[in-house]
């Protein structure tokens, strides 16, 4: 039988765990440390560690507003937590009651698509980026309360069609739930007459 950690020891480990993974939930912390969710919340309060939503907002700093050129951050579905233009980006989307079917609490597919598509637009290093074509696959239903982490990677900039290819993979925990390949037009390919579209 495992010896219970002291409060001080548990709080030190809790702080280290949150520093290494700021997106961990109170529920996951409670399970990890074999204590109640209320104990985790009290420990966080004593250590002045904000709740998950505030930690996510803190990570999605003002810097990202300056980084993203192709659309305002408020138009991105989910919160961008990491981005390097024309390379990769990550966003987090919390599935809430307004995102699910009432009957079965499963997220409507267009929300997962919108998260992936808006991330594919945001990662493009141009003032104008439009989706020309997408190939998507839903792997498993996402449910109310789950957190979807979308990871976009730019695979091919200015390919033979003059488009940029962005691949997006979305996860709940470690489980892949959605994939998408997006062919993007960029403003460098756009003419006033629309000839390049």
Curated annotation (Swiss-Prot):
Pfam families: 4HBT (PF03061). GO terms for molecular function: DNA binding; DNA-binding transcription factor activity. InterPro entries: HotDog_dom_sf, Thioestr_dom, Transcription_factor_FapR, WH-like_DNA-bd_sf, WH_DNA-bd_sf. GO terms for biological process: fatty acid biosynthetic process; negative regulation of DNA-templated transcription; negative regulation of fatty acid biosynthetic process. Keywords: DNA-binding, Fatty acid biosynthesis, Fatty acid metabolism, Lipid biosynthesis, Lipid metabolism, Repressor, Transcription, Transcription regulation. The keyword Transcription applies. Belongs to the FapR family. Transcriptional factor involved in regulation of membrane lipid biosynthesis by repressing genes involved in fatty acid and phospholipid metabolism. This is Transcription factor FapR. The lineage of its organism: Bacteria, Bacillati, Bacillota, Bacilli, Bacillales. The gene is fapR.
């Amino acid at each position: 039988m495992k010896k219970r950690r002291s409060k001080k020891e548990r709080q030190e480990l809790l702080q280290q765990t949150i520093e290494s993974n700021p997106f961990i939930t109170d529920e996951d912390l409670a399970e990890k440390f074999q204590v109640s969710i209320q104990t985790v919340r009290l420990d966080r309060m004593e250590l002045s560690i904000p709740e998950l939503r505030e930690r996510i907002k803190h990570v999605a700093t003002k810097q990202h507003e300056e980084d993203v050129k192709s659309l305002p951050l408020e138009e991105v579905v989910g919160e961008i937590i990491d981005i390097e233009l024309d390379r990769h980006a990550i966003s987090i989307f919390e599935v809430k009651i307004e995102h699910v079917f009432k009957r079965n609490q499963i997220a409507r597919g267009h929300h997962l698509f919108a998260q992936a598509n808006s991330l594919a637009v945001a990662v493009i290093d141009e003032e104008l980026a439009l989706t020309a074509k997408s190939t998507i696959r839903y792997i498993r239903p996402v449910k109310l309360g789950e957190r979807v982490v979308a990871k976009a990677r730019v695979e091919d900039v200015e390919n033979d069609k003059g488009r940029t290819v962005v691949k997006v993979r979305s996860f709940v925990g470690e489980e892949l739930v959605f994939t998408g390949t997006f062919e993007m037009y960029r403003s460098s390919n756009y003419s006033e007459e629309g000839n390049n579209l």
